[in-house]
Swiss-Prot record:
Known function: Produces in vitro relaxation of rat arterial smooth muscle and constriction of intestinal smooth muscle. May target bradykinin receptors (BDKRB).
Composition skew (Acidic residues), residue ranges: 30-42
Organism the protein comes from: Pithecopus hypochondrialis
InterPro entries listed in its UniProt record: Frog_antimicrobial_propeptide
Protein name: Phyllokininogen-1
Disulfide bonding pattern of the chain: none
């Protein structure tokens, strides 16, 4: 009976460890996706609202 308990605890422990590793990898993947989305949004904002009006040149052309 004690052998069954030990093996059951071992199986449950290993399952818990593998589950937590999978959850950690999933969380890291979601964070990377969020960072990519934030970078894309900031790039789009830079394109939409430039610091200078379109056609503006800081140099004078005579």
């Amino acid at each position: 009976m004690s052998i069954l308990k030990k093996s059951l605890f071992l199986v449950l422990f290993l399952g818990l460890v593998s589950f937590s590793i999978c959850e950690e990898e999933k969380r890291e993947a979601e964070e990377e996706e969020n960072e990519d989305e934030i970078e894309e949004e900031s790039d789009e904002k830079k394109r939409e609202s430039p610091d200078r009006p379109p056609g503006f040149s800081p140099f004078r052309i005579y």
